[in-house]
């Protein structure tokens, strides 16, 4: 096995933007999830997040990532389903797919304090990131794994604050459904400490 067992302990910095989209504009959700989760609607629209993540040394793996995810619901509980995700680490790709059903693919990714780019037709300029308040962060991912819904807890703390990203997305690229759309907000989560996945059961 070329990747760590779960849970993964990760650290780094993340920039995330959030859009409100018509449900019809969403990327496809795996049909295997239809009996478990549904798209969460707020004012008749769906919330989509896209994030650049720099997983830095000090965690179980060090790599860069670009992802898009949709806010879902399971009854009254919120869930997150990742629809698109690229990493520059084969270990992260293989572990994400095998452990949690996260559809990771490989890409060339550049991420600095002022610029982000991925070889899938996605770029962003970064300005005005002001992390200042350390907050707890928690959510639950629901993905398709082996034809069934796989639910995975994610817990973190990070220094959070506003940021400004100008996204440049190719209209015919995999994130083209966000092309030309203005995000509602953008945040930075700096110096995050994340635990991704469930702890193994006690013997």
Where are these regions (language model features)?
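N-terminal domain-onset segments
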Residues: 1-65, 75-80, 92, 180-184, ...
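Short beta-strand element of the conserved SAM-dependent methyltransferase core
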Residues: 15-21, 68-70, 165-169
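Aromatic- and glycine-enriched beta-alpha-beta binding-site module
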Residues: 51-122
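Interaction-surface and assembly-scaffold signal
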Residues: 96-203
């Amino acid at each position: 096995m070329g990747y760590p067992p779960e849970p993964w302990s990760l650290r780094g910095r993340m920039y995330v933007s959030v859009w409100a989209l018509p449900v019809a504009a969403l990327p496809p959700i795996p049909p295997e999830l239809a009996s478990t989760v549904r798209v969460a609607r707020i004012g008749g629209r769906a919330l989509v997040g896209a994030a650049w993540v720099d997983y830095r040394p000090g965690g179980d793996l060090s790599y860069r990532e670009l992802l898009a995810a949709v806010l879902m619901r399971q009854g009254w509980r919120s869930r997150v389903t990742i629809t698109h995700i690229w990493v520059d680490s084969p270990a992260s790709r293989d572990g994400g797919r095998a452990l949690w059903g996260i559809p990771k693919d490989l890409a060339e990714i550049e991420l600095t304090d002022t610029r982000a780019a991925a070889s899938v037709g996605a770029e962003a300029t970064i300005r005005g990131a002001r992390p200042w308040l350390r907050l707890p962060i928690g959510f639950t991912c629901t993905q398709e794994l082996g034809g069934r819904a796989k639910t995975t807890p994610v817990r973190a703390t990070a220094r959070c604050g506003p940021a400004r990203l100008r996204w440049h997305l190719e209209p015919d690229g995999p994130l083209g459904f966000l092309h030309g759309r203005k995000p509602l907000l953008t945040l930075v989560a700096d110096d995050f400490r994340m635990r991704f996945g469930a702890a193994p059961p006690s013997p």
